[in-house]
């Protein structure tokens, strides 16, 4: 009958529309995932050019000061750093042990540059070494500590990397005990911290965050 055919036609149209909506939602989800992956890759590789620039400046200084052995050591550490950091997928997380090892390589490079000023303390228990974190997530924080804490100081400055697991949440702290920074030079407004914040947000959303403060006696804690 007419009404029977109309009912079937309406049902067919409704099912077709629902199918198209689901297909559109799946396409939107794929596009959103692709955009997030592209964003994560972009943020990951923002770190590297800045690091290369600083290292080449350091190498140039060593060569000009006729310190070839130290320059060779820095080149070897840089080579190891890049061979390790660039072999993995930027979207993959890495064990905290690997991330700490990368920062030890980076700090070894900077120790050649600041032999009398840079002191290093790493306090990361074995119990959290297997926890996974985004690759190179600590690099901007350690670079900031070098740039604002060590490079501007006239005395020894200690950079500390610590990690603890509290209530199933991994807390990582990078700090330095450098001098009090002028009020017009806010470490918390730099590209490095914004990079870490954006990467954490893109990777974990509200499940992760970054915080920082300036101790009264000076230095910086992230």
List PLM regions with ranges:
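Two-component histidine phosphotransfer core
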Residues: 1-216, 220-221
């Amino acid at each position: 009958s007419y009404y029977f055919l109309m009912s079937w036609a309406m049902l067919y149209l409704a099912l077709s529309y629902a199918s198209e909506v689901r297909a559109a939602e799946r396409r939107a989800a794929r596009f959103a995932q692709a955009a997030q992956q592209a964003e994560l890759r972009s943020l990951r590789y923002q770190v590297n050019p800045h690091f290369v620039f600083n290292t080449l400046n350091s190498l140039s200084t060593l060569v000009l000061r006729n310190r070839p052995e130290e320059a060779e050591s820095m080149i070897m550490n840089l080579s190891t750093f890049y061979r390790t950091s660039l072999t993995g997928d930027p979207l993959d997380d890495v064990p905290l042990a690997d991330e700490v090892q990368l920062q030890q390589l980076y700090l070894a490079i900077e120790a050649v540059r600041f032999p009398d000023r840079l002191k290093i303390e790493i306090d990361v228990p074995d119990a959290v070494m297997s926890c996974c974190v985004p690759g190179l997530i600590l690099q901007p924080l350690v670079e900031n500590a070098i740039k604002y804490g060590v490079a501007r100081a006239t005395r020894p400055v200690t950079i500390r990397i610590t990690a603890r697991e509290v209530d199933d949440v991994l807390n990582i702290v990078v700090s330095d005990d450098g001098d009090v920074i002028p009020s017009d030079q806010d470490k918390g407004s730099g590209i490095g911290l914004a990079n870490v914040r954006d990467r954490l947000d893109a990777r974990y959303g509200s499940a992760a965050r970054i915080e920082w403060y300036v101790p009264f006696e000076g230095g910086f804690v992230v």
